[in-house]
Design a protein with these regions (language model features):
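Alpha/beta-hydrolase active-site loop
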Residues: 314, 346-367
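Catalytic active-site module of serine/aspartate enzymes centered on a nucleophile-bearing elbow/loop
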Residues: 529, 535-569
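Solvent-exposed helix/loop surface patches that form functional interfaces
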Residues: 32-34, 48, 101-195, 199-204, ...
Length: 569
């Protein structure tokens, strides 16, 4: 028994998958008779292993063969693993040749009826064990993730069973209960892949977990994920930085890749419907009618291009609305996220401004874009990035700042914390202590002194280039260098960045006196997500019925852009 758990106990919760495939009731495509592919294993975002998998589909059934290595608390080398099924999904054989920290494991399990007989050696201990198993169990050894190929094939083969029995290994069995299925779209480079995601509840001898498995149209395994354990197993093409899950799309979206500062930015270009077409005629038309363009920038709560906050794809919806009004919209993944390269952990606000400028330059070089009519639209702290970029590049024709803070970064953090503590009804003494701690953290980040009074775990989170640049950012100072037309727009019910910031920004911009024009717009009945709300409080987000960006917001931006881009401005 101890020998068995030296392998299984370590990886038990690492063996449940995250799959994506078509919706229930669809008929899966026929998988190819033979495939070979690689998978990468992640733990907490770090690579901890790899598997090479060969899958054979014949008239005799399904044969899954693999090898690989997992590193962590134990060094597991899989020299060979095989799971073989008959056509009716009855398992026939499970074999494992592996070593754990140099100790050999050689196990052979044969299935007959309701009996599974395992013989061999497990970490140097002789094994001779018989298990009683239910009919047609799925064999999911915790050390061989490729075995989940059988699970995704079964789930995609028709109306999937609501509950499946699982054989983990000798003396260990469990069950999987199907919770939900969902169709998704994954973008790899500029191509897309239809996937189906299955959410399942796993119960076994060592505990329970919610797991997800993803499959392609043929039912082949794409990904296994256990969020609670921070475990992901992905097919290599999905594991690359060139892949992302598409959570929102407009009918005229086009995936593009933009060269940045030594890496590429994954982006989506949204066209006005009137500009779409193909062939030489469309290219000639685009070149003859250069269109105005808008670069959309997300705040700190969203890292990927659609700007999803609390389930609302803010930037994705803005891009669609502006395209309907005749503007090309570009949104992109922040560096180190989604399909964009670069290092997220070392990026400052200034670095994000550089990325925005890379997009502006890319647009300026296109034959279908009017380089004199390119504006930036930033939401929340994305507006700060837009201001920094506009100060550096006069070719930017204007900046629209949506729900932007007017305070310095340091003041903003303290304002947010006070608000959260008030909502939580924290005792006054505890509230004072937490605010004082945050003040010490802010001082240490900006000066490099005083870290001895800050807990080590908090220092690890706070002592970053991005947070340092955030705390030191001052909108008043940034506005002194911005000469382009400015639009400040805010929802009156914004609970995260209260409406008082709107008037302050307008005053700061007018006082700076550099901008050619300053427009200030307050939108009634709209919250921080730019959608209609009753109270605007964060606690209301989950119950919002209308999750579409307000037409009043998009109309105000459209009208300002039209005025800003007008000839003679």
């Amino acid at each position: 028994m101890p020998g068995r758990y030296c392998i299984w106990a370590i990886w038990l919760l690492m063996a449940v998958p995250l799959a994506a495939a078509p919706s229930q009731g669809d008929t899966a495509q026929q998988p190819p008779p033979s495939t070979t592919r690689g998978y990468t294993v992640f733990l907490g975002g770090a690579v901890v292993g790899r598997e090479e998998l060969t899958v054979l589909t014949t008239a005799d059934g399904l044969d899954i063969i693999g090898k690989g290595r997992l590193s962590g608390s134990q060094d597991l080398v899989i020299n060979r693993a095989e799971v073989r099924y008959r056509p009716d999904w009855t398992p026939e054989v499970y074999e494992l040749e592996a070593s754990v920290n140099g100790g050999d494991t050689l196990l052979y399990t044969s299935f007959a009826g309701t009996t599974a007989v395992t013989k061999g050696v497990d970490a140097g201990q002789q094994v001779a064990h018989t298990d009683t198993v239910p009919p047609q169990p799925v064999v999911l050894p915790n050390v061989f993730f490729g075995a989940y190929e059988a699970l995704t094939r079964r789930l995609a083969s028709g109306a999937p069973a609501q509950e499946l029995n699982v054989f983990v290994g000798f003396g260990a069995q469990g069950s999987l209960r199907l919770l939900s299925t969902a169709a998704e779209l994954v973008q790899i480079g500029t191509s897309t892949l239809n996937v189906r995601r299955y959410a399942l509840a796993y119960a076994g001898p060592r505990g329970a977990a919610t797991v997800h498995v993803y499959a392609d149209d043929a039912g082949s395994l794409l990904r296994v994920s256990i969020p609670a354990q921070r475990i992901d197993i992905m097919r290599d093409d999905l594991a690359a930085a060139t892949s992302r899950t598409v959570v929102y799309s407009n009918p005229t979206d086009e995936a593009v890749v933009i060269a940045g500062a030594g890496f590429n930015l994954g982006a989506t270009l949204t066209w006005p419907a009137s500009a779409r077409g193909s062939g030489e005629a469309a290219s000639a038309k685009a070149a003859a009618t250069r269109l105005p363009a808008v670069v959309l920038l997300a705040g700190t709560a969203a890292n990927e291009r659609d700007g999803v906050v609390a389930g609302v794809p803010i930037l994705g919806q803005l891009a669609g609305a502006l395209a309907d009004a005749g503007f090309i919209g570009v949104r992109y993944d922040k560096r180190g996220h989604g399909q964009s390269g670069g290092r997220a952990e070392s990026a400052s606000l200034g670095d994000h401004a550089d990325d925005a400028l890379a997009v502006v330059r890319w647009l300026s070089n296109r034959r279908d874009v009017d380089r004199e009519r390119i504006a930036l639209v930033g939401h929340n702290e994305g507006a700060w990035t837009a201001l920094l970029a506009a100060a550096r590049e006069r070719r930017i024709a204007g900046v629209a700042a949506i729900a932007a803070p007017s305070a310095t970064g340091s003041e903003r953090v303290l304002e947010q914390q006070r608000h959260v503590l008030e909502q939580m009804k924290v005792a006054p003494a505890e509230r004072v202590a937490k605010i004082e701690l945050q003040e010490r953290i802010n001082t240490a980040v900006m000066t490099g002194r005083g870290w001895d009074s800050v807990p080590a775990d908090l220092r690890k989170q706070a002592d970053t280039p991005w947070f340092q640049s955030f705390l030191g950012f001052n909108p008043a100072r940034a506005l002194e260098d911005v000469r382009q037309p400015l639009l400040f727009i805010h929802g009156e019910l914004d609970d995260e960045v209260p409406i008082l910031h709107l008037d302050r920004l307008g005053e700061l911009a007018r006082k700076a006196g550099r901008s050619r024009s300053v427009a200030v717009v307050a939108v009634r009945g709209v919250n921080h997500l730019l959608v209609p709300a009753s109270t605007g409080e964060v606690s209301e987000y989950a119950s919002l019925k209308d999750r579409h960006v307000s037409a009043e917001v998009t109309s105000a931006i459209r009208e300002w852009l039209t005025k800003t881009f007008a000839p003679g401005r």
